[in-house]
């Protein structure tokens, strides 16, 4: 079925021509060899372009690790990132101009690229590249097939190699600053009421930072698709894992609507109460993502709901670089549920997001060289360069064979300038979590238990020691993977207006963006909640839930074929 998107497109041809003119060229020689790397026959480096529909930081053209990787693989990729548009708008611009980079990850805009015929089918290539072939099981590759039966993209994340090694909770949680926990002598925080009372009490006793800057007790990110920081907390408060668009009863395998639950009412009523008390940041509903990150980076924000990947590598590094960790400004997850029930937020095993991934476009003039580069990036030598860096410069190897970093190396790794000039993780290309081939080391520093703990700021170490844990994961607990349906967001993220359920999903998003801020700010909560519920029910959510249920049933049926 063809898909449709409603997209605002501006500066179409000009933008596309500016960004991606000359895609995939290597200084005049386009006859790249794909054997043992992608270097052209005359030794020149082949250059590709890539666009990722998420915000990111560009690295310097003379980046040191990128150059080392280029010398070893024969390829260098110029990466560009999303600025000033949604993913769908940016992709719509490219589609309208019919000009593309060599590589692309369009996020929620992937269906537009597929419909436009902009992507290269990968089926006939995968078997030629062993690292790519082994990246997924046969079942997982089959899950990536589109309605025409072909595979067009490779999901880049949550692929676990060997033994799982996880120290960070990369997903959604209630976060609170270490200074708040220390002030309260590291209390047990189990409920939503516990969480907000602690923030209230701390802010009443300590309304400013050391320099006199006022705290922001609690802020909410609501911009564009990131409004999950506001709207989907009820499913987590009820203890469910992150299916994103619904909850799933693991016994009956039925989808449930968290938007209308009793917990949803209690949660939004609590936010309303905290807003009236001045605890919720009044700029929450108008701030941009950049403004939100700037607030976190300043150390002023005591608590928030967010996903680790959405703030840690920006605000976390900024806090460390500014020395604000010495004031206890790092964020720690706490297992908050509505009534203290067990949470299922962190799950073992990888999560296959079949809804988007890295694709190669029709404008790539050497698909085999592009895929050889992806294959090379998954080799252990290059993967270590991407995530550990250069041995002796970015990390050391102990007598026991374990990788570790010195204090100076860790400090450098957090510096913005050093990351731009030296580090090159090719972060939106396929990658592994888990264990290296040596069976000892984690594929990334964040998974190396001793290195992870040694590299923690002192405020986090003190908190972990007080709670008797060594990782963020242990703060929350871990659970087995929920089931073959999981996660449902990999389906709902690509809903389109072609179906009744997809139209309902679009309308629900619009209603939430408009109504939920009003619910939080209203003087009369009950009246505002009724207005919101009336608008929500008018969106025909049953159609949306019905399509989710059909997809869940399909996933369970497909999984049964491989049992």
Model-predicted segments: where are they?
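Ligand-binding "clamshell"
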Residues: 112-125, 150, 207, 314-344
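Helix-loop-helix "hinge/cap" segment bordering the ligand-binding cleft or interdomain interface
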Residues: 150, 155-228, 249-304, 358-400, ...
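C-terminal motif of bacterial Sec signal peptides marking the signal peptidase cleavage site
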Residues: 18-22
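Carboxylate/His-rich catalytic cores and anion/metal-binding grooves
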Residues: 117-145, 199-203, 213-248, 302-326
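Long, K/E/R/D-enriched contiguous segments that form extended
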Residues: 283, 293-339, 350, 356, ...
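Bacterial N-terminal signal peptides that target proteins for export
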Residues: 1-10
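Conserved small-residue motifs centered on glycine
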Residues: 384-514
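Conserved N-terminal structural module of periplasmic/extracytoplasmic solute-binding proteins
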Residues: 8, 23-194, 206, 232, ...
């Amino acid at each position: 079925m063809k898909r449709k998107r409603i997209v605002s497109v501006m500066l179409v041809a000009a933008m596309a021509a500016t960004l991606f003119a000359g895609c995939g060229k290597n200084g005049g020689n386009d006859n790249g060899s794909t054997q043992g790397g992608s270097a052209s026959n005359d030794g020149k480096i082949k250059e590709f372009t890539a666009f990722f529909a998420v915000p990111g930081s560009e690295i310097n053209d003379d980046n040191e690790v990128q150059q080392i990787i280029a010398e070893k693989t024969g390829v260098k990729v110029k990466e560009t990132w999303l600025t000033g548009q949604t993913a769908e708008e940016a992709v719509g611009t490219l589609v309208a101009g019919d000009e593309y980079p060599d590589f692309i990850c369009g996020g929620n805009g992937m269906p537009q690229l597929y419909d436009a015929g902009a992507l290269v089918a990968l089926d006939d290539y995968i078997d030629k590249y062993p690292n790519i072939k082994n990246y997924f099981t046969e079942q997982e590759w089959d899950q990536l097939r589109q309605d025409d039966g072909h595979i067009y993209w490779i999901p880049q994340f949550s692929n676990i190699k060997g033994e799982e090694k996880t120290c960070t909770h990369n997903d959604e949680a209630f976060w609170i600053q270490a200074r708040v926990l220390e002030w309260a002598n590291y209390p047990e925080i189990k409920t939503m009421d516990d969480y907000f009372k602690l923030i209230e009490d701390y802010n009443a006793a300590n309304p400013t930072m050391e320099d006199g800057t006022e705290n922001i007790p609690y802020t909410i990110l609501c911009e564009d698709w990131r409004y999950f920081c506001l709207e989907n907390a009820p499913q987590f408060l009820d203890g469910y894992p992150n299916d994103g668009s619904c909850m799933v009863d693991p016994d009956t395998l039925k989808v449930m609507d968290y938007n209308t639950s009793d917990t949803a009412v209690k949660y939004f009523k609590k936010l309303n109460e905290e807003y009236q008390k001045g605890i919720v940041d009044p700029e929450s509903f108008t701030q941009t993502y950049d403004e939100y990150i700037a607030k976190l980076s300043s150390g002023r924000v005591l608590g928030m709901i967010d996903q680790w990947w959405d703030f840690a590598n920006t605000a976390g590094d900024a806090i460390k670089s500014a020395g604000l960790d010495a004031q206890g400004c790092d964020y720690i997850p706490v297992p908050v549920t509505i009534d203290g029930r067990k949470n299922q937020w962190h799950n073992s095993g990888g999560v296959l997001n079949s809804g988007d991934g890295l694709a190669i476009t029709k404008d790539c003039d050497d698909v085999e060289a592009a895929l050889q580069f992806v294959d090379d990036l998954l080799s252990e030598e290059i993967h270590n360069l991407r995530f550990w860096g250069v041995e002796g410069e970015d990390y050391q190897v102990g007598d026991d064979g374990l990788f570790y970093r010195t204090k100076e190396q860790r400090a450098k790794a957090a510096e913005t300038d050093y990351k731009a000039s030296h580090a090159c993780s090719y972060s939106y290309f396929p990658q592994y979590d888990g264990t290296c081939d040596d069976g000892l080391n984690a594929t990334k520093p964040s998974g190396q238990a001793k290195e992870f703990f040694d590299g923690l700021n002192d405020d986090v170490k003190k908190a972990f020691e007080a709670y008797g844990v060594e990782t963020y994961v242990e703060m929350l607990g871990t659970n087995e993977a929920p089931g073959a349906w999981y996660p449902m967001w990999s389906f709902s993220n690509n809903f389109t207006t072609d179906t009744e359920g997809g139209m309902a999903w679009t309308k629900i998003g619009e209603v939430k963006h408009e109504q939920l801020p009003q619910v939080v700010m209203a003087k009369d909560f009950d009246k505002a909640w009724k207005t919101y519920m009336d608008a929500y029910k008018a969106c025909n959510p049953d159609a949306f839930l019905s399509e989710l249920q059909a997809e869940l049933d399909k996933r369970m049926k497909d999984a049964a074929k491989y049992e």
